[in-house]
Amino acid sequence: MASHLRPPSPLLVRVYKSGPRVRRKLESYFQSSKSSGGGECTVSTQEHEAPGTFRVEFSERAAKERVLKKGEHQILVDEKPVPIFLVPTENSIKKNTRPQISSLTQSQAETPSGDMHQHEGHIPNAVDSCLQKIFLTVTADLNCNLFSKEQRAYITTLCPSIRKMEGHDGIEKVCGDFQDIERIHQFLSEQFLESEQKQQFSPSMTERKPLSQQERDSCISPSEPETKAEQKSNYFEVPLPYFEYFKYICPDKINSIEKRFGVNIEIQESSPNMVCLDFTSSRSGDLEAARESFASEFQKNTEPLKQECVSLADSKQANKFKQELNHQFTKLLIKEKGGELTLLGTQDDISAAKQKISEAFVKIPVKLFAANYMMNVIEVDSAHYKLLETELLQEISEIEKRYDICSKVSEKGQKTCILFESKDRQVDLSVHAYASFIDAFQHASCQLMREVLLLKSLGKERKHLHQTKFADDFRKRHPNVHFVLNQESMTLTGLPNHLAKAKQYVLKGGGMSSLAGKKLKEGHETPMDIDSDDSKAASPPLKGSVSSEASELDKKEKGICVICMDTISNKKVLPKCKHEFCAPCINKAMSYKPICPTCQTSYGIQKGNQPEGSMVFTVSRDSLPGYESFGTIVITYSMKAGIQTEEHPNPGKRYPGIQRTAYLPDNKEGRKVLKLLYRAFDQKLIFTVGYSRVLGVSDVITWNDIHHKTSRFGGPEMYGYPDPSYLKRVKEELKAKGIE
């Protein structure tokens, strides 16, 4: 092709990025009829026009018109969507700089009617579309001195989707998209010109000529009622999404208006994303009342509308999600296309629906990272585990249900290994399972008791206790109780319910005295001290010789560290609760979590690696299931994008910002939890940075191990209400971090 030949339909486009790679992506995009609607074309840079400007030259005019008709375009650059803005060429701008209706006295001869202009009729819409993207909303103050209250009131009929601000003298300010403001400006200009003409000319000269069909088709604002012999006609345009929503919410309203006022309403698409409603009636019909009725109903139902799009990770389930949401949100218009849901409705409904999608239907992965390591197995002393086994197996079963994981318990030498693995590939809550198990293990360890049975009073009967048969029988009958036998006493260690049965079994021979043990969590000199007061309550009064022997045992008995379950060495006493541990054991435990493993007393202020962001809340009158007498506290977290630090998994890498919403009942306990959450947020404990299995990407912001209710409904399995124990649980989670 000769270079001087110019393709018939050039088009300028603008993106926020530039360079050869972007040019190639644009060329590939506009050559794809499936992606853009375009066809054979070439793309060249136009940096002299403005940064990021490219010229697309289509071989066929039809390809260009298909691109313009589609309206919105975008390409992927570095796996991120980049919008494409369509800019008309210089010739197109010159053709369309003239107003659509130059004046009220415009003659039919002045109306463009050539074929070329008909072909280029989409270009103004492309301009409008581009402008609407630049100006999401435009606010205009009206000059009330120029127009009557009635003229200004007609604005809502002209543009039903406009938002108005009224004063004592009617509408004073309007707010809407750029196209609506243009319509209002044109209408008021016509009204002003009419009034000027009435003052300058006779009534016979001010009569308005009927608009030609072409003028009517190109006119944005509604025409004035046009009187004919048998019929009068009027129409206006509204945005297509808003009209679809209106028909969805009020399916019979159009028919009702037609019957009530004796009119006919013809509906057709007038331009991309716009709908024309043509009101016609016979002389007996009330056309103006019908228009006003429709405008009032339309504005009432569409004024608070917002529209948002949600892309789903699994496009096959998009239709299923749409059906589920349609059942729950009857006033939300939901459209599905190619795995993307378009939500049109009030902001509250959209927010609630997005939460359902993100937190319920598509489970959000929550992964916790401890400092510089990721837990994948727990090892405990096998002898210690045996003492707690029945209690821990129940807890493991609860953990499996709570976090949708499976567990595996195995012995390796003197150690018992506990492994948790997620059942769901898209959500991994195993770290929560490990944390819950550690808490349960420490709690159960604190319930262990030791009891010393003195054998002296048994005389010869105690010989059978030293036989192998007794030891084998005891271990078989009481596998969860550890016993140590010497010449003077038998020491039993286990949980209280197991210990009572084992003690009864040993004492069947009679005549054997007992010294009741104490719980490990009591704060005396050593965790395993013998409590003589409990001893007296548990058995008949002992003779002096027995008491003196117990005193000797007190002196010989050494403290046991509940972390390693061995004799305490290099003892360290915690200052608040006075519990004692091996110094290396407690130092290591404190490095993971600065709390006492025995009583959960906090030591020091925990600081997390939460990214920068904000936390705000509002109060809604709507109640939560289970808290019908109270309103709802709505918490909004807005976390900023940033760069990971040394505290995060991949220092130096960027992470995107997110917004999350959580709900609490607006009662005394809920407000208490709100204050605690604010403290946790200040200590950077609410969020962390990790890996999202749903998105398939790393380096994103995820929840930390303080659980939130991110849905109003659905119960615990949907992260919602009712959940009677939630507030208690979250306070315990906060307490474990030193926040109470």
From Swiss-Prot:
InterPro entries: Deltex_C, Deltex_C_sf, Deltex_fam, DTX3L_a/b_dom, DTX3L_KH-like, Nucleotide-bd_a/b_plait_sf, PARP14_RPM_1, TX3L_RING-HC. It comes from the Eukaryota. GO terms for biological process: defense response to virus; DNA damage checkpoint signaling; DNA repair-dependent chromatin remodeling; double-strand break repair; endosome to lysosome transport; innate immune response; negative regulation of ubiquitin-protein transferase activity; Notch signaling pathway. It comes from Homo sapiens (Human). One of its GO terms (cellular component) is cytoplasm. Gene3D superfamilies: 3.30.390.130, 3.30.70.330, Zinc/RING finger domain, C3HC4 (zinc finger). Induction: Induced by IFNG. Induced by IFNB1. Autoubiquitinated. The gene is DTX3L. This is E3 ubiquitin-protein ligase DTX3L. The lineage of its organism: Eukaryota, Metazoa, Chordata, Craniata, Vertebrata.
